[in-house]
A protein has these predicted regions:
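Low-complexity, small/polar and acidic-rich linker and loop segments
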Residues: 2-195, 209, 215-224
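Short low-complexity linker/loop segments enriched in small residues
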Residues: 644-758
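Long, charge-dense tracts
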Residues: 189-190, 219-327, 331, 335-336
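Hydrophobic alpha-helical segments
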Residues: 748-842
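Eukaryote-specific, cytoplasm-facing alpha-helical/coiled-coil scaffolding segments in long proteins
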Residues: 216-227, 448-455, 657, 802-806, ...
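Short, mixed-charge aromatic SLiMs
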Residues: 141, 443-458, 698-702, 758-775
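Hydrophobic, often aromatic-rich secondary-structure segments at membrane interfaces
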Residues: 300, 304-419, 424-696
């Protein structure tokens, strides 16, 4: 009769005969003994425990072999794709890379192929990590369908359907509550949870579905704050709240009561250090790595519904939907990373760099050096950034202060950015469509509906099509178009930033403009579904995303979608819904194309520009804070140059490129002129005279989001009284300087009057400085439709109270304004009402 001892000996002999090494034999033996012990402790006889353990070990080895084969196949596919893309860099005309710093460099061209795997570059065929991530996000959020409009974010980022949130948790955990909406959301979430597993496995990863799965994202800051010394309170709470029937070792074994305290000690350290203190891979009898991976995926700790709510209330940030949406964002990143770089992204990234070096070396030492520079300064920091390899310390007071102040300054300073964004995005969309041979833009009606007249319906259509409008699921996103930084920092400051973006129409415009491009794309494909691939004027653009004639034929054979009468789309997501054989691949290509092109037409701050400005420096260090300040508001202009500089390189001839750049430059100069004049009017001033070089220079710079530098064409200081050195240092440094002057200015003046040799009398000007400080840094004070009224009715009144000389100073400033810029005020400073309407005077 089989027993544990005889099976172990038999198994070891068999493994030796099949060529297994000692280390692997020991791993399998340990696994058998662990499973046998589990069954024995569950009440099974020794013989039955050995039999069941034998079955588990063999099943595990079979699954392991299958997963190994699957991962190998995925890696080979990724490797082949990477080699093909790098070879494209070898063969591409070097003239396409004149925008990348090394004129005529083959090494740069080869290394740029690697960078294009992380972020879209139209000079290379295929998808990138960022686009793949958007594809995954869209497919997952689409599963919520109409319910997303009931429990997403509403006006000013407020959570909709708050009363239903606790019941959503209970429904996910299998408890019937009688709440119809909660049931619908829970069912949709469970589909999302299963789909993330399926998508990860299809990409080459290894995950198992979990019944009634509900993620939990505990905040390191709140754990430290409320968890007691060394986590004593947190550990007691977890011992009481965790569902120990479901919280098991990764192999399914029960975690014994005597093992739980040590386990929670290690989990506490891992979660409160944001993963910096990893669980030892040898811990828990070799289960450490698996436990760490499950913690990272929020799949290790399990609670019933009521205890999950207790845990969330005490140790988590945000609400239930924030947790669900956050999990989607995390899994979208991981799935996209595996799709792009295979099951072992770090190893693949190193292989990519090795291939780049090998190919560049064939073209000489200079090409190799140029390639190394791109890998070091672009690829490596971009890869580290998307994988959070140098994440900010979650406990850092300095980091929270820097990011929080960045959000406050965004709220105070970007309230009129929509003056440039709205006309600019229409101009850029027209330029991109011309580049792609897509014809004139016909989506103005859709834009108006998405912005004002039919918002909810357009949001629902977008979500169902796999194009998630970020403001529906995130309380803050629009400011990242300009800074790339507005989605971090203390929650209150994020809300301030987002409130300004929404009230100034920046959020609504960005949402509407991007959806207009996306919907027009799907409508265009529907209208052209009767044409052969070679007859499509925009076929070359499709080929950049790896789309072939066969792909087009498969997509145009789909049943069109008609969300409302007279509106028909050819949607990539229907390739999945209608069970086409290669539906997932079709969806990735066509959806990726639409995502990437919409972000070219309506641009935002890019990953590469952020890395170029900040590297991987963190704002919780002194040098990182200084660099953070320097980079604010410079990310978008640099991104603008990168996006459209490289897009123009798609023209085949030098004259074609120059013509496209000239047309875009002229168009954006007109946009800058319009935005500049609208901004002047919003501040109570007449439009600027336009018959001078200074205005044209300011308009040109404004068209590229550099309007603050345009002021120096008229005067040595800008509208805030800052010189070029202050602008270069960034708003955080300027804020620190102004704060220091406000707090300590009178101290130094008093010391000088008392301790100096002069007889001058000390006069405090702190009140006047405080009003100017508030005028410049009050959140929301720059919102275009409220700015003039706030200036005249609030800040001018306060200035009169704080400074007896305020009226005289205003008259002096008005004369200087007229002398430097040539325009006057239609709403005179200090007056309670406008004296006339704005006038243009030459």
């Amino acid at each position: 009769m089989l027993n544990q001892v005889s099976f172990v000996q038999c198994m070891q002999d068999g493994l030796k005969e099949r060529g297994f090494g000692k280390k692997r034999i020991k791993e399998i033996t340990d696994q058998f003994e662990e499973r046998a012990r589990f069954y024995s402790e569950s009440g099974k006889s020794d013989d039955m425990a050995a039999t069941l353990a034998q079955r588990d070990v063999f099943d595990f080895m079979s699954r392991e072999q299958f997963e190994r084969i699957k991962r190998s196949a995925a890696m080979l596919s990724v490797q082949a794709s990477n080699i093909g893309r790098i070879q494209a860099g070898v063969n591409a005309p070097v003239s396409k890379f004149l925008m990348d710093g090394k004129r005529g460099s083959r090494g740069t061209a080869i290394a740029r192929a690697a960078v294009s795997m992380l972020e879209h570059d139209p000079r290379f065929t295929g998808l990138d990590y960022q686009t793949r991530k958007e594809n995954v996000r869209g497919a997952l959020y689409a599963l919520f369908d109409a319910t997303l409009g009931e429990v997403g974010k509403g006006f000013m980022g407020r959570q909709k359907g708050k009363a239903h949130l606790p019941n959503i948790v209970r429904e996910i955990k299998g408890e019937a509550t009688g709440d119809a909406l909660a049931k619908q959301v829970a069912d949709a979430w469970l589909k999302v949870a299963d789909t993330t597993v399926d998508m990860m496995n299809a990409a080459g990863g290894s995950m198992n579905r979990l019944a009634n799965y509900l993620p939990q994202a505990q905040s390191a800051v709140r754990m430290v704050k409320d968890g007691g010394e060394n986590g004593a309170i947190w550990k007691k709470d977890m011992l009481d709240w965790l569902d120990w029937e479901r919280t098991r070792w990764p192999d399914g074994s029960i975690i014994k009561p005597e093992e739980r305290a040590d386990l929670l000690d290690r989990v506490w350290l891992t979660l409160t250090t944001d993963g910096a203190n990893k669980i030892d891979v040898t811990a828990f009898r070799g289960r450490g790595r698996a436990v760490g991976n499950m913690l990272d995926d929020h799949r290790f700790l399990h609670f019933n519904g009521e205890n999950w709510l207790k845990m969330h209330a005490k140790y988590s940030d945000g609400n239930v939907m924030d947790t669900l949406f956050g999990h989607i964002e995390q899994m979208s990143h991981k799935i996209a990373m595996v799709e792009q770089f295979g099951p072992n992204p770090e190893m693949t990234a190193n292989n990519v760099k090795s291939i780049v070096r090998a190919e560049a070396a064939k073209h000489g030492a200079k090409a190799l050096n140029d390639a190394e520079a791109v890998l070091k300064n672009k690829f490596d920091p971009m890869f580290e950034t998307v994988n959070r390899m140098n994440a900010m310390d979650p406990h850092s007071v300095m980091g929270a202060t820097v990011t929080g102040m960045s959000n406050v300054l965004t709220s105070a300073m970007l309230g009129s950015a929509s003056f440039l964004a709205i006309p600019g995005d229409f101009m850029q969309t027209a330029a991109v469509r011309a580049l792609n041979n897509q014809g004139l833009f016909g989506g103005v009606g859709t834009y108006v509906k998405a912005l004002a007249t039919d918002m909810q319906a357009q949001k629902q259509i977008a979500t169902q099509s796999g194009f998630i409008m970020d403001e529906v699921v995130m309380s803050t996103y629009a400011a990242s178009r300009w800074t790339g930084l507005a989605t971090v920092g203390p929650q209150l400051t994020r809300r301030l930033s987002e409130a300004t973006m929404r009230l100034s129409l920046m959020s609504g415009h960005t949402r509407a403009a991007r959806w207009t491009v996306q919907s027009e794309f799907m409508g265009m494909m529907f209208r052209d579904r009767g044409r052969e691939f070679g007859d499509l004027p925009y076929a070359p653009m499709m080929q950049r995303y790896g789309i072939t004639a066969d792909d087009w034929n498969a997509l145009r054979a789909l049943q069109p979608w008609e969300p409302k009468a007279g509106v028909q789309f050819l949607r990539p997501i229907d390739a999945i819904h209608q069970n086409v054989g290669n539906g997932a691949a079709l969806y990735r290509k066509f959806q990726g194309m639409i995502h990437a092109e919409s972000r070219t037409a309506v641009p935002e701050a890019t990953l590469e520009a952020g890395v170029a400005l900040r590297g991987t420096m963190r704002p919780d260090t002194l040098i990182g804070a200084l660099v953070h300040s320097f980079s604010m508001y410079k990310n978008f202009p640099m991104s603008f140059v990168m996006i459209y500089g490289r897009s123009g390189m798609m023209k085949q001839t030098a004259m074609g490129r120059l013509g496209w750049y000239a047309a875009l430059g002229a168009g954006m100069t007109l946009v800058g002129a319009l935005g500049t004049q609208m901004r002047e009017i919003s501040r109570g001033r007449d439009p600027l005279p336009m018959d001078n070089v200074g205005f044209m220079g300011k308009a040109f710079l404004s068209g590229g989001a550099l309007s603050i530098w345009g002021d120096f064409l008229f005067s040595g200081v800008n509208a805030f009284g800052q010189g070029p050195q202050d602008v270069a240092a960034g708003p955080l440094v300027s804020f620190l300087g102004d704060s220091t002057s406000l707090v300590l200015g009178d101290t130094f003046a008093f010391a000088d009057s008392v301790g100096g040799l002069s007889d001058k009398e000390f006069k405090s000007n702190t009140g006047a400085k405080a009003v100017e400080f508030a005028r410049r840094y009050t959140p929301g004070a720059s919102i275009w439709w409220a700015r003039a009224a706030l200036e005249r009715q609030v800040f001018d009144r306060l200035q009169d109270l704080a400074d007896p000389q305020a009226a005289r100073k205003r008259q002096k400033q008005m004369r200087k304004r007229k002398q430097d810029y040539g325009n006057e005020y239609w709403w005179t400073p200090g007056q309670s009402a406008p004296s006339r309407v704005p006038e243009y005077r030459r």
